[in-house]
Amino acid sequence: MQLNPAEISELIKSRIEGLAGSSDIRNEGTVVSVTDGIVRVHGLSDVMQGEMLEFPAGKDGQPSFGLALNLERDSVGAVILGEYEHISEGDTVKCTGRILEVPVGPELIGRVVNALGQPIDGKGPINAKMTDVIEKVAPGVIARQSVDQPLQTGIKSIDSMVPVGRGQRELIIGDRQTGKTAVAIDAIINQKGQGVTCIYVAIGQKASSIKNVVRALEQAGAMEYTIVVAATASESAAMQYVSAYSGCTMGEYFRDRGEDALIVYDDLSKQAVAYRQVSLLLRRPPGREAFPGDVFYLHSRLLERAARVNADYVEAFTKGEVKGKTGSLTALPIIETQAGDVSAFVPTNVISITDGQIFLETSLFNAGIRPAINAGISVSRVGGAAQTKLVKGQSGGIRTDLAQYRELAAFAQFASDLDEATRKQLDRGARVTELLKQAQYSPLSTALMGASLFAVNKGYMDDIQVKQVLAFESGLHQFLKTSHGALIDKLNASKAMDKDSEAELNAAIAAFKKSFA
């Protein structure tokens, strides 16, 4: 058979044209070792710190991803995000050229997701239009605005003595089983109708505990404006470490668009332990309490992203779509202490990063004072400027009464006969302590809280038995709602008390007291 050169060239041309070639040049490496979710990879020359690496697919047919953390001379140390049992020595690893990203946007509201933003609530896929990187630089000094708007938690002892402002970082610290999560959940429930989107990040908790939190939020109607990011105790240390940054990125989406968001990290002690585990497996040198040297930076770079940003920042970020609006991300990090030791490594770090702390004490909790907040050592460094005038006007006396009561109560144990003034202070302090008790999942509006504080400050509760104080308060609230609804609406709207309102409130409390038996 004679072959014509023209035919051969035509055949080669058609073959070349029909070739579906790929111009996808990817840096590839080989797995050298796999231990406890840590993979050593050889041959990745152009990998970035924090880059996503693509590993072979698992049982579900989806590729597994890892996070490059250690960049050494001839190998890369990476953590696998998720299952790693199917990865073996000699497998091919590819660079993706992307930093780890999670879905963001309003589509996530009302859903429970894992640390990578994948739904785990069985309600179908999340069709988020955007993704964003989990590691971002916090807003600079010029982009920030001072904290001067209140974020009401609805908890009397916090809003009166340790107020929180929008854009603040307020630490909740205490031993296990002192009600730390309950305080944070109450704060989320109280944001209903306040225009605040909430993100609850559960790190290293039991799946049953997270389920209970989600159920409580659903019953209170709070899931309508809340995203839950869950990294349970059964998930890898890498997922627990990443989850806080994922939640923060989801919150920043709202902050950068001139909206307000609240994020709860429950809790950062477990995140630090997860990071310690990852670091030790990567053979990084251990420091104090075996934590790596950068554990302070771990939390500071996370909490610095919670801020109030000014209108110029929002306008520049949205390219002029949103004008004249400031955005905020308020953080309530939780830290668990061991036997009340706040001088341990991680607690002291987070105390120094945050703008104040709420101390919860086991002794108060066991004595039935719940929320078990120690007002003496709890402080809010910037929230005072953001406190509502109504509560601020009534709370000065409360803090003084409590401080004097604690001091005198210690002496009164040894003194047999007390003068009249001391007796009065002890009685007032006992009533204030009783009044600051509050049931879980029952946050108060600004007006009702102001009315309670007003009543105790004006002496209306001085002749009521201590055990009757909460019943008096509950009855007063019901009376005000039914008979003085207009006054309550006015106080809630203005968040301040003028002379007319004060006179009406005085008359209302006096009228109720006559009927209270």
Swiss-Prot record:
Its EC number is 7.1.2.2. This is ATP synthase subunit alpha. One of its GO terms (molecular function) is ADP binding. NCBIfam families: atpA, PRK13343.1. It is a peripheral membrane protein. It comes from Delftia acidovorans (strain DSM 14801 / SPH-1). One of its GO terms (cellular component) is proton-transporting ATP synthase complex. Keywords: ATP synthesis, ATP-binding, Cell inner membrane, Cell membrane, CF(1), Hydrogen ion transport, Ion transport, Membrane, Nucleotide-binding, Translocase, Transport. It holds the Pfam family ATP-synt_ab.
